[in-house]
Structures are given as structure tokens and as C-alpha cells.
């Protein structure tokens, strides 16, 4: 009987079509998983539709933001160069000069923000095309989890603060009661 069971185990059919078996003879990279290794045919596959759409949407947006950043920076530097001599010449009229310098500094900060936004946009597009970043739904799920954690933390802190205030109020009542009952020559309230 034991030999029959052993023979059954030896002849088990393992050709289940639902399980992916690695194909080592395939010419699609390492292990047949579509890697881009030594035997890759990456050039014949081409980019996916999502990658093309991301490139079409991301490059103009990133380029526009970088252009805006450059123009804003140039305008801010010119404004700053004009405002410094004006400030020195017309120092009695300090309010317009301060306003000019404030606008120049605001322009420089706006330029930096445009540049940072443009670079992060281009970086995201490149990471998306390389496949190294999470997908948008995964990023949204992560953001939702972070928001839920923050709300939970704020709720916990609110409860702790409420308990703290309640304890302090109880402490103050006890201290007041102890002060009233132990003062010499005074009777307790309510008697």
C-alpha cells in the first residue's frame, strides 16, 4: 500500500495553467519575467500607453513651470538690481523702496517655488517612465492612510487634553474644598 502512495506522489500532474512557470529558454531577459537583462528585446516592445500619456502630459507642464521659474527669477533679479540704488538715493521715501524690495523678494521666492515644482514634476515623470515610483492610486492610498493616522493622532491628543483639563478641574475642586474645610473659625458650606 505504501508503494502505491509513493507512486501516486511521483506521478502528480503539475501542469496547472493558472500558475506561471518561469521559462528559462525565453529570450525576454532573466528568468522569463520580462526583465531588461542581457537577452532583452526591449527595443521591440516600446513604451506603454501610460508611459506615452505621462510623457505627453508631464513634459509640457514641467517645461512650462521651468520656463516660468526662469522668467520670474530674471525679473526678480532685475527688480532687485533696480531697487537697491533707488533705495540708496531715495532713502527718505522708505515705503515705496520697501515695497519694491518686498516685491523683489516675493518674486525670488515665487521663482524658487516654480522651479521646485517644475523639477519635481519632471522627476516624477521620469520615475514614472522608469517604473520606479508608485502608481497614483497607491500614492492616494498612502495619503489617505497618513491623513487617517493624523486624524486619529489629533483625536487621541484631544482626548488626552480633555482628560488633563478634567483632572486639573477635579484637583482644583479638591484643593478648594480642603481649603474651605480646614480654615480655622469657618464652618463648612451647606451646614
From Swiss-Prot:
Record key words, sorted: Acetylation, Lipid droplet, Membrane, Transmembrane, Transmembrane helix
Keyword Protein transport: no
Region (Polar): 2-54
UniProt subcellular location: Lipid droplet; Membrane
Location of the region described as Hydrophobic in the Swiss-Prot/TrEMBL record: 55-128
PROSITE patterns per the UniProt record, alphabetical: OLEOSINS
One example of a Gene Ontology biological process annotation: response to freezing
Main location per the UniProt record: other
Residues annotated as transmembrane: 52-72, 99-119
Bilayer topology: Multi-pass membrane protein
Claim: Phosphoprotein is one of the keywords in the record: no
GO cellular component, one term: membrane
Pfam family, one: Oleosin
Residue list for modification N-acetylalanine: 2
Family: Belongs to the oleosin family.
Job of this protein: May have a structural role to stabilize the lipid body during desiccation of the seed by preventing coalescence of the oil. Probably interacts with both lipid and phospholipid moieties of lipid bodies. May also provide recognition signals for specific lipase anchorage in lipolysis during seedling growth.
UniProt name for this protein: Oleosin 20.3 kDa
Amino acid at each position: 500500500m505504501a508503494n502505491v502512495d509513493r507512486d501516486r506522489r511521483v506521478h502528480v500532474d503539475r501542469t496547472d495553467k493558472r500558475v506561471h512557470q518561469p521559462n528559462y529558454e525565453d529570450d525576454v531577459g532573466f528568468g522569463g519575467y520580462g526583465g531588461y537583462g542581457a537577452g532583452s528585446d526591449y527595443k521591440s516592445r516600446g513604451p506603454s500607453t501610460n508611459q506615452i500619456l505621462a510623457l505627453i502630459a508631464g513634459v509640457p507642464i514641467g517645461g512650462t513651470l521651468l520656463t516660468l521659474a526662469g522668467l520670474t527669477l530674471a525679473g526678480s533679479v532685475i527688480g532687485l538690481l533696480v531697487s537697491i540704488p533707488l533705495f540708496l538715493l531715495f532713502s527718505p521715501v522708505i515705503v515705496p523702496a520697501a515695497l519694491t524690495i518686498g516685491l523683489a523678494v516675493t518674486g525670488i521666492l515665487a521663482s524658487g517655488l516654480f522651479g521646485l515644482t517644475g523639477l519635481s514634476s519632471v522627476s516624477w515623470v521620469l520615475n514614472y517612465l522608469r517604473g520606479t515610483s508608485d502608481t497614483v492610486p497607491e500614492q492616494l492610498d498612502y495619503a489617505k492612510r497618513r491623513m487617517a493616522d493624523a486624524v486619529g493622532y489629533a483625536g487621541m491628543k484631544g482626548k488626552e487634553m480633555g482628560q488633563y483639563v478634567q483632572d486639573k478641574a477635579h484637583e482644583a475642586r479638591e484643593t478648594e474644598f480642603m481649603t474651605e474645610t480646614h480654615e480655622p473659625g469657618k464652618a463648612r458650606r451647606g451646614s
